[in-house]
Amino acid sequence: MPRRRVLAALLPSLVLAVLLPGLVAPAAAEHEIFYRFTVLGYVKDARGKPVAEATVQVVRDKTGFSYLGATDARGLFVVLTRLGDESVGEALTVRQGTTERRIAVAFDPTNHTDERGTRVDFEGARAMEHAAWFRSTLLNVVGVTTRH
């Protein structure tokens, strides 16, 4: 009899353990798809040579939360941030060393197919946003510009 009571007491926990992963996974996947904003670009020295292992910081000005990335041997960095549809127009500060660039988040909040992001390049003490180059750079780096 005590064994049945133990099993009866454990049954709700076992059901939750089996069902909970299935309930949580879709939410995580949806969050990944609709809340990603990528900041990528290149870091070069004043002579135009790539800077490897440089740290790049992207700060969400509204909250102060920051995201970090580092350059590879080509000077390329890719920083993934979490910004939802409501974040259009929000300010981000992209910083490498003492050089920074403040940008406004821009994307079509109704488009949940194309990757969202911008390109910011650092050369010497200058930082320049090249939003129009984002898709072509992403295609060269990753090979896709749409979400699956």
What residue spans do the PLM features occupy?
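Twin-arginine (Tat) signal peptide motif
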Residues: 1-8, 21
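Bacterial N-terminal signal peptides
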Residues: 10-22
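Short acidic/proline- and small/hydrophobic-mixed sequence motifs that coincide with surface turns
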Residues: 50-52
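Short, acidic Ser/Thr/Gly-rich low-complexity loop/linker segments typical of extracellular
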Residues: 62-80
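Short Pro-Gly-centered beta-turn/loop motif in secreted/extracellular proteins
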Residues: 78-89
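Beta-strand-rich domain onsets/edges
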Residues: 23-47, 61, 131-148
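Edge beta-strands of extracellular beta-sandwich domains
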Residues: 100-109
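Hydrophobic beta-strand segments
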Residues: 54-59
